[in-house]
Each structure stands twice: as C-alpha cells, then as structure tokens.
C-alpha cells in the first residue's frame, strides 16, 4: 500500500512542476517579471508627464564587455561620455499601494561615461569604470538621485571581476562633465549582433557635435548611399589621440617600473639597516682592547741632552763665550 501511494504522489509533484512550464511555452502568457540581466543595471528615475504628474520609473540597461569593447544594449560605446538613444525595458509603478508594476519598452536617452584605468599591480590588467545617467524617457525629462557605477576588472581582454554600486549623482564623475562635450551616437538601431543585409546602405558612426556630410557614389546594381556623417580632419583631434596613446603608454611604463623601483629601495634600506645592526652587535660582543698605531711613551728609555740656544745674528756673543771657555 505504501508503494502504491508513493507513485501517484511523485507523479503529482512532477506534473505540478511541469504544467506551469508547459503553459508558458504553449501560450502567449508572459513569464513572471524578472530582475535586471546578469550584466544589467537598474536606474530609478522620476519623470514628469504633460499633466504635471510625477511618476516613478525604473530603466533597465544591459551593459556588457566583449573583446575590448563596451556595449550598452548591444550598442558600442567608446571612452568618454556618449549620449545614446535606444529602446530598453522600463518598469513603471502605477499603484504604489497595491505594488502594481507595468513593463513596457520605450525610447530612452542615456549619458554613458566609460573610463579605462591601468592597475598598478599588473601591467596587463585595467579597470573599466562605467556610469549612466538617464536624460529622457519617450521625450519626457527624467531626473535621478543616484548613479549606478559598474567596475569591470579586465586582464588581456578577459573579464576577471564585475561589480556595481550606487553613489549620489552630485558626487559622480559623470555629473562634473559638461553635457556640451557629449559624443552623439547616431542611428541607435545598430546592433553588434545583427546582420547587415545587402540593401542596407547607411553606415553607423560615433559622432561629435560638429558634423559634416560626405556624399557616396552609387555602385552598379545597388541603391545609392545615404550621405554619411563624418568629422572633418582636425590636427587638434589627431594631437589629442596621440596624447591619449602617449598617456596610456606612460601609464603602462610606470605601472611596470614603479614596483621594481620600490623593491630596489626596500632591499637597499633593509641592507643598510641590517649591516648597521650587525656591526653594532659585533662591537658589543668583541670590544677593542687598545688602539693600534699609537706609540706608547711609557715603555721607552730616553736620555736628556741639554741644548744651548743662541739668539739669531749675535756672532760677538758667541765669540765671547768661546773665549771664556778657552780661559
């Protein structure tokens, strides 16, 4: 009887686990709301509607690092402050008393700061710091109190550690950088995972505030190229790029030289102090009885000889003395 009862119980447990999963697969019912992705961040913002009502919303961004490139929602972001507009998941709190949430996708304008810092204890490692600030949500101004900062420790383009924490917006580096220097990202539908079709003719570039257009010539059998946006050649930009490369080279050089220099100084200091200590101990254990190289006058036998000194230039007195001795 016990074996007959245990079999239906196990079947019931199996059906209890399998039926909800089968229902999610066969029906169009959405899955339970999940948290941010593994490499994602949640930014709490406050938006103001046209009627003047404030609403609390949460923007979910997926930030990844792959082969030396930082991606925000699959959009490539370079070092500096980049302003991008992309579609992302937004969680809106409709009823605070019942804790009701509404999930939808909207167009979000975000400022992303990416900094690359060398690590002192390893020349091949670097720390990538990422900060994000939401500017607009579907054309509505957004405000936030805190900034989520992500620190990615990378060695040879391989992620070693991924950490994130919150800090006040006024204390962040992103807040201190003027929005006029932001790099504008054009054509936000570009994705690193998407395939470019044969009829797609528009290219995607990271653009600055000053933009020019370059006309493309149509090839036989293909659609004409859309005018491309490009930055005019500038000696200042080339100089900045060269200085940035020089700065990175100097950082790598000093990160490899400074540890060796400190090790050398440690060896020198320890050697000098150790030698002084050994000499002091030897002096205490084996003191010197007498000093060598000093003539001892007590042990010498001497005979005193009288010496008569004559004044200089007195020949007459000398002759008188000789005469007296003759008499």
Swiss-Prot record:
Intracellular or extracellular location(s): Membrane
TM regions (residue ranges): 260-280
Gene Ontology CC annotation, any one: membrane
Signal peptide: 1-23
Glycosylation (residues): 44, 62, 146
Keywords, comma-separated and alphabetical: Glycoprotein, Membrane, Signal, Transmembrane, Transmembrane helix
UniProt cross-references to InterPro entries, sorted A to Z: GINM1 (IPR042319)
Cytoplasmic compartment spans: 281-327
Keyword Lipid biosynthesis: no
Protein topology in the membrane: Single-pass type I membrane protein
Record has Metal-binding as a keyword: no
Chain ranges on the Extracellular side, renumbered to this chain: 24-259
Full protein name: Glycoprotein integral membrane protein 1
Annotated source species: Mus musculus
Taxonomic lineage: Eukaryota, Metazoa, Chordata, Craniata, Vertebrata
Gene label: Ginm1
